[in-house]
Amino acid sequence: MPVKEETINLRIDADVSRQFREKCETDQTTVAAKVREFIQNYIKQDSTILDQIPANLHSGAPIPQLHAGALRVAEMFSGPGGIGIALNRTRSRDFSFEHVWATDYDRDTCRTYQKNVLKDTPDAQMYCCDVRKLDIDRLPTADGFLYGFPCNDFSLVGESKGLNGNYGGLYAYGVQYINRVNPLFFFAENVSGLSSANEGKAFKRILTALNNAGKYGYTITANLYKFEDYGIPQARHRYILIGIRGDLGKTFAVPKPSGIQKSCAEALRDIPEWAANQDATKQSALVQERLSFIREGENVWQAEESGRLPEHLRLNVKGARMSQIYRRLDSTKPAYTVTGSGGGGTHVYHWSENRALTNRERARLQTFPDDFEFIGSKESVRKQIGMAVPCDGAQIILEALLKTLEGDKYESVAPTIGVFPAKTYREE
């Protein structure tokens, strides 16, 4: 008896189609034969085969075509402008970014962002308030949404409270905006401690919410970025989730690290006299004397254990000893992580001079340009710098994102966490 056949029409992104045809040629088979193979294997309940099919190949839904031009972007929990400056700089063949609105709760931070990031986009709105008091339903729409939801309760520095802390649940306000607006993409950033908060439950809950957000869901590429591997002069590790709307049929690939590390000494070279935020941190005579016994790359505990540190300069600390206390930089390596808070001994110390770094030097390690002026007191500026995403690191990721939207190839590596097709992930 002859087999009854029927035709299935599929509409897919042109770049995905090209890649699929190239794969078929490599396997020395036809497109029709390969599609039949996928379908037959799927019917046999081998559901892993479905993950091999590019997003939307099996949905039959038309794929929206993106028009060249400026993508309107919004930032929640913007910080002083690490990502904002990267948005201003990033261009591609077809796309650029245009700020629509941003929000942060800290007044100095908002003033810094307004002065530096929005100086050429006066129509963009800066909302300076607690996000819990913001009317999400009245915020302007945007093509892209970026947010570094507060990391205080997910950080590895200090006690990690995760979703049970005061700030752990604030990611949900971003999800609320995505649900309402359905932007083309989102960029979500948090500290490396996110994966272990609440025994991993925090990350799973956030991933579930973002993967299933909006009308179409978002195909998410989740990766732990070690920015020092991308030429940033600082060991700074951040989870970044790039989500592309499910109906677009595209998946973000993690850009390949440069493999070139930039030393902190190179980064701090030739700071111009006119650059703002260069006021020296006042060091007591006791602190200067203590630093004189600490060698390049060492912390106070190592100096103490070596027997070099006199008794009157030792710290009477019980319990856990943080490795960054009075730790000098190693001039031949990237700096250790620049933080935004902490008491005595946590200010990042010069490799040879008996002093802490200036805020401008700390900003250099975060790759802020020298003409970027932070607003506020010395401690306020320190906090702003320490909470930011490195400008150059964000730009590398945003450039890859635009290439993804354009369908252009670039060198990439497998994500450390994984790729989650739209509306497929559920918290266990």
Q: How would you name each of these model-derived features?
A:
Residues 1-14, 21-29:
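Short Lys/Arg-rich basic patches
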Residues 27-52:
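Short, basic amphipathic alpha-helical segments that act as recognition/interaction helices
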Residues 48-65:
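RNA-binding accessory domains that recognize and position tRNA/RNA substrates
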Residues 60-182, 192-196, 201-204, 211:
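Core alpha/beta nucleotide-donor-binding catalytic domains of modification enzymes
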Residues 70-73, 236-238, 333-335:
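Extracellular structured ligand-interaction cores
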Residues 114, 240-244, 339:
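Short, well-ordered beta-strand micro-motif
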Residues 134-142, 152-325:
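Class I S-adenosyl-L-methionine
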Residues 288-428:
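C-terminal target-recognition/interaction regions appended to catalytic cores
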